[in-house]
Amino acid sequence: MAKSDSFFIRSSIEPDNLGTFVQSSIDLGAYVDALGKSVLRIHNIAVTFSDSLGNAAQLQAASDSGAVQFQLTTQSQSDTVTAANRAVIASGIVYAQNSFSSDEFPLLSHDMDNLPQLWTNGYLIAVDQIYLGGEASTGWVAAENMTISLVMECTVETMSTAAAMALALSQQ
């Protein structure tokens, strides 16, 4: 497979801190054309959970807790799905707890999901849109919604038309 130099695709969503699933599409039409034998390989994904300004998020007082999660999929979703769903490219969950009596930066754990994403040979994409979805629970300081941002390191590669179409059909 011939491939390009690596480049970066960025996206973000702002869940409402009420546990409501939100989703945004990421247009890959400039990179992916299965009939033209062009596919995208995602090599790495870096994810940030922050407030809308990129600052560290705080949890509310009184020993509150919270969670924020994301998923990157090849198909549109109406809610969070498990990693067993064939549309899932990547996902992650962060759990947090504030044990103080004032709004503070929380103790964090990400032991329940595969954040960060590590692949030996990357993840091939042959669809022209992928979807970043996520949600955040109550407990985060209400002044700012959580922001889930991701940066993907990618290359464009060529495949045979038959292989690219088969991959595209498997991801729809």
Q: Residues of each region from the PLM?
A:
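C-terminal interaction-tip segments
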Residues: M1-G19, A34-K37, W140-Q172
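Low-complexity, Ser/Thr/Pro-rich intrinsically disordered segments found in N-terminal tails, propeptides
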Residues: M1-Y31, E104-D113, W119-I125
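Beta-rich globular "head" domains
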Residues: S24-S78, N85, S149-E153
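Noncatalytic modules at the cell exterior or secretory-pathway interfaces
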Residues: K37-V47, N121-A142
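Extended, solvent-exposed segments with strong compositional bias
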Residues: T73-I125
